[in-house]
Amino acid sequence: MPRVASVAAVLAALLPSALGQANTSYVDYNHEANPDLFPQCVATIELSFPDCENGPLSKTLVCDKSARPHDRAAALVSMFTLEELVNNTGNTGTGVPRLGLPKYQVWSESLHGVYRANWASEGDYSWATSFPQPILTMAALNRTLIHQIGDILSTQARAFSNVGRYGLDTYAPNINSFRHPVWGRGQETPGEDAYYLASTYAYEYITGIQGGVDPETLKLVATAKHYAGYDIENWDGHSRLGNDMQITQQDLSEYYTPQFLVSARDAKVHSVMCSYNAVNGVPSCSNSFFLQTLLRETFGFVEDGYVSGDCGAVYNAFNPHEYAANESSASADSIRAGTDIDCGTSYQYHFTNAFDEGEISRQDIERGVIRLYTNLVRLGYFDGNSSQYRDLTWSDVQTTDAWNISHEAAVEGTVLLKNDGTLPLADSIRSVALIGPWANATTQMQGNYYGPAPYLTSPLAALEASDLDVHYAFGTNISSTTTAGFADALAAARKADAIIFAGGIDNTIEGEALDRMNITWPGNQLDLINQLSALGKPLVVLQMGGGQVDSSALKHNTNVSALLWGGYPGQSGGTALLDIIRGVRAPAGRLVTTQYPAGYATQFPAIDMGLRPNGTNPGQTYMWYTGTPVYEFGHGLFYTTFEAKRASTATNHSSFNIEDLLTAPHPGYAYPQLRPFLNFTAHITNTGRTTSDYTAMLFANTTAGPAPHPNKWLVGFDRLGALEPGASQTMTFPITIDNVARTDELGNRVLYPGRYELALNNERSVVLRFTLTGEKAVLMKWPLEKQEIPPAA
């Protein structure tokens, strides 16, 4: 992350004289993926609220609670001078002191906990709950859990904002899809599936954060990011700031934008962030096709929703993209294309010049600022203590309920990849050797984008608090090639009844601005695991980190008893992992990414955005991959056995006419394709001896429509809680018309006649077949890609 300047430096930088100065120092952003930003961009500031009782604004329309939010905001902005207007177009706005309008910081974060807050050094407001990274939370396959986390995050954020320590909007969630396994920021995402996983995560997180679906009073403004085609940091020297991603309209519609469609159309997100990269030659923040044609006209983005550029992305349209001739033109292009707020300083530095040159009008500038302040009106920013969430305090942050949810997410997301019966550990195991670079992890468990947590329970701390004897040895580092710690590790292992190795990857080799060049276990961790396995004792390996590594060697080593994937588990990570290992809880998570063999990472360039297989590309994601994975997308074992039987109300081999489906009444659904037309119902019985949750993924497949055909695609998931031995429950998946549509070469969503299958999990334990008849039908027409940046208004 960029360095954060002091508040004093920010205030000095925000003087109007400073904002009129241009940046003339250019960095080669084609190779530098994470340069420092200007101090006024990255600073945290003390939030304060306008005084609508006795302040200068008290008699103006913006303080009239009975007026429409847009009208209140427009009345406020109409009072700004041009200089004042320009000064409030960046993420760090100066406010308007003469009107009693405080400065405001748009840039706050809440990926998996409150972040970029004005933290107290100790005591109240010095920490917030740290949840697992989204990729682990998504592996739990629990919608309710995602929504709860969003709700808790916004409650804690509002408590911080009420005392001036946080803003009222947040740059989260990250809903890009984890397309290629080397991507450093995949840990921040819900996994590799765009259509169902990322879209569901987006919906639940956004509605949790914002306080519902477009509520009258917003709780917090969520920002769906990064729009669009952003999933490479610095792979092989390709900087995220200068990447020009070549994406077909088919892939753009099918894979890179459906989660943004759901965010805008269904969840009613109030902010979207355009990304650093270009797509098909046009930088995202200067892309009118993305920001107007798709987002507003096709996806139905809320009228007063605002688009924020990623931090520095407006400037990047000039350097390194060279799409604009200079920074002033880059700013003019971006505001007219639809980027309302610049997370950066380009707008503030260059709008006055662009206005003088006739490149933009006051109306162009006002549009984005009005949208921002309309949202602040809906957040209660101008409503004083009567605002719905102004009574939230520190007592709403320090709740054990939030801590319990964090622990639950870590438990539910943990995935059992391999087990020979060693797990859960038998009661006869009284001593354990804990070895490896994750064994004593604390902040390591938080991944990236994290703030101070109330506590961080490492695996070592959790074990030492148990009734087991613990023999700890570091063994080796994440990327170490020295064997200096091997002897101590082996000595500790010889003293113990069982061995736990905690390793994998972490933010030293994956993260923002940091991609991997391979997907092998780094350093000499596998060498140490192999030597430990030769001791012939029960050996449990914890594979940690967001991205997958090729664990073929562990899968096939019969002396490796069990393998768990634990992601970045957050503040309760050690306790959660120990609960799984000892059988206090049973694992039921499923992989939300494919674990590929190591050769996949070098088989084709990671910047190849094509999903479908071709002569050099074996296909990307579980939908299109033609090879054999180490562990499949959706893989996950249990401590018990389950039997799944079809109990569907729809008869197998049913037939549906396409025209009838689309012309049938659809009350409660804005679009006919969102109406369920059949239910897939499975009867699940715990046939084993251990109480366990049960998770399932439902996949569709067909040979209808044009080739190539996907292997399958996800149309549902669910989680049943705590099935006791012998107990049964049913899980029902409503199947919508859109669920079984495909995307044609033009990007249209099309329903094709033909035979279809719905299958439960990779094992296909329950299968339902049906046929669609009649003529194919376009469900959503993808617009023609063209750039039409309007002239200055």
Curated annotation (Swiss-Prot):
<dbReference type="InterPro" id="IPR013783">
    <property type="entry name" value="Ig-like_fold"/>
</dbReference>
<keyword id="KW-0325">Glycoprotein</keyword>
<feature type="glycosylation site" description="N-linked (GlcNAc...) asparagine">
    <location>
        <position position="87"/>
    </location>
</feature>
<comment type="pathway">
    <text>Glycan degradation; xylan degradation.</text>
</comment>
<dbReference type="InterPro" id="IPR002772">
    <property type="entry name" value="Glyco_hydro_3_C"/>
</dbReference>
<feature type="glycosylation site" description="N-linked (GlcNAc...) asparagine">
    <location>
        <position position="440"/>
    </location>
</feature>
<dbReference type="InterPro" id="IPR017853">
    <property type="entry name" value="Glycoside_hydrolase_SF"/>
</dbReference>
<dbReference type="GO" id="GO:0045493">
    <property type="term" value="P:xylan catabolic process"/>
</dbReference>
<keyword id="KW-0858">Xylan degradation</keyword>
<dbReference type="InterPro" id="IPR036962">
    <property type="entry name" value="Glyco_hydro_3_N_sf"/>
</dbReference>
<keyword id="KW-0732">Signal</keyword>
<comment type="similarity">
    <text>Belongs to the glycosyl hydrolase 3 family.</text>
</comment>
<dbReference type="Pfam" id="PF14310">
    <property type="entry name" value="Fn3-like"/>
</dbReference>
<feature type="glycosylation site" description="N-linked (GlcNAc...) asparagine">
    <location>
        <position position="559"/>
    </location>
</feature>
<dbReference type="InterPro" id="IPR026891">
    <property type="entry name" value="Fn3-like"/>
</dbReference>
<protein>
    <recommendedName>
        <fullName>Probable exo-1,4-beta-xylosidase xlnD</fullName>
        <ecNumber>3.2.1.37</ecNumber>
    </recommendedName>
</protein>
<dbReference type="GO" id="GO:0005576">
    <property type="term" value="C:extracellular region"/>
</dbReference>
<dbReference type="GO" id="GO:0009044">
    <property type="term" value="F:xylan 1,4-beta-xylosidase activity"/>
</dbReference>
<feature type="glycosylation site" description="N-linked (GlcNAc...) asparagine">
    <location>
        <position position="652"/>
    </location>
</feature>
<keyword id="KW-0119">Carbohydrate metabolism</keyword>
<feature type="glycosylation site" description="N-linked (GlcNAc...) asparagine">
    <location>
        <position position="679"/>
    </location>
</feature>
<dbReference type="InterPro" id="IPR044993">
    <property type="entry name" value="BXL"/>
</dbReference>
<dbReference type="GO" id="GO:0046556">
    <property type="term" value="F:alpha-L-arabinofuranosidase activity"/>
</dbReference>
<feature type="glycosylation site" description="N-linked (GlcNAc...) asparagine">
    <location>
        <position position="385"/>
    </location>
</feature>
<keyword id="KW-0964">Secreted</keyword>
<keyword id="KW-0326">Glycosidase</keyword>
<dbReference type="GO" id="GO:0031222">
    <property type="term" value="P:arabinan catabolic process"/>
</dbReference>
<feature type="glycosylation site" description="N-linked (GlcNAc...) asparagine">
    <location>
        <position position="518"/>
    </location>
</feature>
<feature type="glycosylation site" description="N-linked (GlcNAc...) asparagine">
    <location>
        <position position="701"/>
    </location>
</feature>
<feature type="active site">
    <location>
        <position position="310"/>
    </location>
</feature>
<feature type="glycosylation site" description="N-linked (GlcNAc...) asparagine">
    <location>
        <position position="404"/>
    </location>
</feature>
<dbReference type="Pfam" id="PF00933">
    <property type="entry name" value="Glyco_hydro_3"/>
</dbReference>
<dbReference type="Pfam" id="PF01915">
    <property type="entry name" value="Glyco_hydro_3_C"/>
</dbReference>
<comment type="function">
    <text>Xylan 1,4-beta-xylosidase involved in the hydrolysis of xylan, a major structural heterogeneous polysaccharide found in plant biomass representing the second most abundant polysaccharide in the biosphere, after cellulose.</text>
</comment>
<feature type="glycosylation site" description="N-linked (GlcNAc...) asparagine">
    <location>
        <position position="614"/>
    </location>
</feature>
<feature type="signal peptide">
    <location>
        <begin position="1"/>
        <end position="20"/>
    </location>
</feature>
<dbReference type="InterPro" id="IPR036881">
    <property type="entry name" value="Glyco_hydro_3_C_sf"/>
</dbReference>
<feature type="glycosylation site" description="N-linked (GlcNAc...) asparagine">
    <location>
        <position position="142"/>
    </location>
</feature>
<keyword id="KW-0378">Hydrolase</keyword>
<feature type="glycosylation site" description="N-linked (GlcNAc...) asparagine">
    <location>
        <position position="477"/>
    </location>
</feature>
<keyword id="KW-0624">Polysaccharide degradation</keyword>
<feature type="glycosylation site" description="N-linked (GlcNAc...) asparagine">
    <location>
        <position position="23"/>
    </location>
</feature>
